[in-house]
Amino acid sequence: MAPIEVVIAGGGLGGLTAALSLRHRGIQVTVLEAAAELGEVGAGIQTAPNASRILIALGMREKLEAIKTEPMDQVRRRWENGKVIALTALGEYCKKTFNAPYWHYHRADLHSAIHAQCLDPDGPGPAVVFETDAKVVEVDRSNPTRPVAVTGTGKRYESDLLIGADGIRSTVRDLIGLPDTLVFSGEMAYRALIPGDRIVKDPATRWLVDRYQSTIWYGPDRHLVHYMIRNGEYLNVVALAPCTDEVRDGGPRLVGPEELMGTFPDWDDRAHAMLSKADENVLCQALYYRRPDPRWTDGRVALLGDACHAMLPYQAQGASQAMEDAAVLAEELAKVTSSGIDDALARYVFRRARHARMVQDASLQNKTFYHIPDGPEQQKRDATLASFDGESDISYDWLWSGTPLDDSDDEKFHYSFVR
């Protein structure tokens, strides 16, 4: 029986993790990337233990340790004075409790590392094939068991399964006729990378490098997130606030530190000192998410990641959930031949859709939870944070444990951090 062939539309972190997961199961994969070059934009990303566990199981521990920055704690602060509301241990605690780390990266570094692992000639299974400048514009399903992805250049890629991992505005999703579930959140995000040497030189910001932490500032209607990447080379900052009509209607734009600081008036001086060091290339864009919908497949076409469950960034789980999709889908496909793909896809959706929906819902709840106006409700929230291991109704213990994998894989997905 011929091995399964898979085509993945989309070469982002979710698509690459799916490709690598499938390769490890002995499945031949071709990745079609719409851009002329494979890569990721410059920004920070967090992988909580549920994602780190998957990547390490795919043989990536050494590559990840070479590019990671490890935060010791997650700190929550009050907007107007920087008072610490609560502190959650990360670092060694995560590795001991979840047998997997909580690490920060530059997105481009993480993307490059997974890409290299996909191509490694010494890796298990057939090396992944990559095609760039290959935007999928048509899906030919005249043969229902052999979908054909047709690119803008007219090339045709036939396989047993087409996976749409092409992001929040998925073309594959549209081509197979699934409903439009995109929802405007009412919020926008500023994303900045601030050079670490600027942080170190100023006594007002030097505290940011004294101890690596993942920090969230809570304020009425808006919040800040920041953490170091590349071991202090950059401070990654994400600032979220109510979206303006200009940003919603005009699309993403670049702004300077003046607008960034002006969006957080009267905040603690330390927050302003940090934001003032941004360059004139701060990306500002509206935030969207997908309304939960269990329809992730149609025939021999399946969706993965943001294409089926795009979520707001209030759990820092978007990429991590795509990686969980990848691990589960590869596990299910490894159990079958071509004739069993439909059943494998049904099990994939059964195991992942509810879990992803819960993370989506928790992220949406945190939109309100983070932004409670000062008063009794805010005081109650702060007291809860001081004693709880998570946020909303989703605990970190549940979230960071991840989607359960089959018992047969327990050993494979276990990697001791005891040296």
Residue ranges of model-derived segments:
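Active-site-adjacent segment of FAD-dependent monooxygenases/related oxidoreductases
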Residues: 43-117
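Acidic/histidine metal-binding catalytic segments
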Residues: 66-69, 129, 265-284, 340-346, ...
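Conserved H-loop
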Residues: 28, 61-62, 124
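Conserved mid-domain beta->alpha element of the FAD-binding
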Residues: 9-35, 163-164, 190, 226, ...
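Catalytic P-loop NTPase motifs of RecA-like helicase/translocase cores
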Residues: 38-39, 171-172, 310-312
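C-terminal helical "tail/cap" subdomain of flavin- and related membrane-associated enzymes
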Residues: 2-4, 81, 273, 294, ...
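Conserved FAD-binding catalytic core of PHBH/FMO-like flavoproteins
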Residues: 75-77, 81-85, 103, 112-279
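Residues at the starts of beta-strands that form the adenosine-phosphate
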Residues: 5, 28, 234
